């Protein structure tokens, strides 16, 4: 079954996401993510899980930080709590969390998603051989490279919509800039900051939390015309990230992606979306570009 998995930042949106066509919702763990998404405590996630069960949608937790030695024990304990309350899965990037799930015989609840690091079939096969549920392919690859991995390895996923996380620094660079430039407005946990390169017009969302600073692409990844070949090659999970996306555009994108997966022509649906949301800097990203090695 091909599943659409969408980020969720409000409890009241769970039912709406299900109605729009989402099979899974992704919620971010407080203190556990490299992401600008709204985060939730484990107690809050338990409440979200109850709501998800009511509307019959699966709930996955994003926990994609890399944890230093001083924090890994606490992170492992949080993962244990999440698995014990019954979430459908946890999306991780730190291999140090794997042993906890294995000790509970719940390694099949993990999705390995190290942002841009899964770039070959060998990578994906290795992580799936550990018993994990799924592996996310890097979205910064060409169509040819993605199809090669997907056709060789089952149970893969990929981000197909939203701004892509491009850069992470554990240093609080925005806070440092605020101090040097004597800026009064708080830059920490500020969702309204963008970077622009001197010779480019694109605006890159920038965000800082306790884990560090993150920079996103200056384009919104869209994959309307690519859903059919990706699906035919074997990709099973299609992730859609809604941070920095207007809610109406995100919900329309979900509905339109569902239409494509149900058989409509992807290019025609893409044109419909672009016509409706001309202000969004949508792009097919790196699908048609040669990866530099």
Task: Label each PLM-derived region with a short phrase.
Residues 1-116, 136, 143-293:
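Active-site pocket-lining/capping segments in soluble small-molecule metabolic enzymes
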Residues 120-122:
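Conserved nucleotide-cofactor-binding alpha/beta core module
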Residues 131-132:
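As written
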């Amino acid at each position: 079954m091909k599943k659409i998995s969408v980020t969720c930042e409000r409890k009241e949106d769970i039912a709406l996401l299900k109605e729009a066509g989402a099979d899974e919702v992704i919620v971010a763990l407080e203190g556990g993510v490299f992401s600008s998404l709204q985060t939730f405590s484990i107690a809050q996630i338990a409440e979200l899980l109850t709501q998800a069960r009511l509307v019959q949608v699966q709930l996955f937790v994003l926990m994609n930080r890399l944890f230093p030695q001083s924090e890994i024990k606490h992170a492992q304990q949080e993962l244990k709590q999440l698995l014990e309350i019954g979430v459908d899965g946890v999306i991780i990037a730190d291999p140090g969390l794997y042993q906890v799930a294995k000790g509970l015989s719940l390694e099949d609840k993990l999705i390995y998603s190290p942002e841009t690091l899964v770039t070959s079939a060998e990578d994906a096969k290795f992580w799936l051989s550990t018993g994990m549920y799924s592996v996310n392919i890097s979205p910064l690859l060409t169509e040819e490279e993605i199809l090669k991995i997907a056709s060789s390895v089952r149970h893969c996923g990929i981000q197909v919509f939203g701004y892509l996380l491009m850069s992470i620094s554990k240093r609080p660079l925005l806070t440092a800039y605020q101090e040097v430039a004597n800026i009064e407005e708080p830059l920490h946990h500020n969702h309204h900051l963008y970077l622009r390169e001197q010779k480019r017009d694109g605006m890159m969302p920038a965000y800082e939390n306790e884990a560090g600073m993150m920079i996103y692409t200056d384009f919104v990844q869209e994959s309307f015309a690519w859903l059919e070949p990706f699906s035919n090659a074997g990709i099973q999970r299609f992730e859609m990230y809604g941070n920095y996306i207007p809610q109406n555009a995100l919900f329309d994108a979900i509905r339109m992606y569902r239409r494509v997966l149900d058989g409509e022509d992807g290019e025609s649906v893409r044109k419909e979306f672009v016509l409706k949301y001309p202000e969004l800097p949508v792009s097919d990203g790196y699908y048609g570009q040669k990866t530099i090695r």
